Amino acid sequence: MSETTARYQAGKQQEDFRHYDDSTPAVVRDFYRLNHTRQTVEFNRAMRAKWLNLDHAEMSVWDLMTELNKLVDDSDPDTDLSQIEHNLQTAEAIRADGHPRWFQLAGLIHDLGKVLWLWGEPQWAVVGDTFPVGCAWSPKIVFSEFFRDNPDVGVPEYQTRCGIYSEACGLDRVMISWGHDEYLYHVVKDYLPPEALAMIRYHSCYPIHREGEYTWLMNARDHELMEWVRRFNPYDLYSKGHTKPDAEKLTPYDQELIAEYFPAKIRW
């Protein structure tokens, strides 16, 4: 869970983020090797069956968020801050630009699904960039060369443009690789507006919202919602180079924000 060279650097510029090449820290490369080898269709179906009954815990959003102090994301080359520090950074950047409170809340909670790691799942099954499974992998997925060892290579249908899906079927019908995005979406889908839910569900899906891949699987509503994901992304990504947040000072505001949208406890 640690890296010998610090990844967090105050004052980083936008061009300094998301560098995935030979200079990428070994822990990040090793993460994607595992992720791309093991994110199969079979695995994704099993994870949805395991987690989406939401029968693993019942607790408040705030208490869950404080649990994430224990996590530093091995897939992220840009920060070695705790997860709660990153969540606070993101929410504060959104707030500073005057966006609605639901937008701020999306920033505050967008990574809470990473609690799956604290509950026993390996990081390769929790964090990192996401992508559709059950169809051909885009070469624009970071470290796409690692897919060569994925067992789904041997399933011809999965190696076609649409795979097990149909043209313009809509992303609701597409399995995106399992991780914290998909899990948290199902936890909070009854409490937040569709735009916030799209930010949560697809913020790690860089092949779609950054690279413009898989548009042939999207419907008109997906294209509308993806614009909100793109609005959210700079806050998630570029706030990592800013000053560390004062968690104690921000706590009253953030607790009030959570209480505005969520009951005292929800199912996880």
Task: Indicate where each model-derived feature is located.
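Non-catalytic interface/linker regions that flank or bridge core catalytic/transmembrane domains
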Residues: 1-60, 70, 268
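Charged, low-complexity, helix/coiled-coil-prone segments
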Residues: 23-54, 119-135, 143-147, 167-168, ...
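Residues that form generic nucleotide/phosphate-binding pockets
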Residues: 30-34, 50-51, 64-71, 93, ...
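Alpha-helix initiation and N-capping motif
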Residues: 44, 58-65, 193, 222-225, ...
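Active-site flanking loop/helix segments enriched in acidic
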Residues: 49-85, 166-171
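Short secondary-structure junctions and interdomain/linker hinges
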Residues: 71-75, 207, 236-239, 264-268
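Divalent metal-dependent catalytic cores for phosphoryl transfer on phosphate-bearing substrates
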Residues: 79-249
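Charged phosphate-binding loop/patch that engages nucleotide di/tri-phosphates or the phosphate backbone
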Residues: 252-268
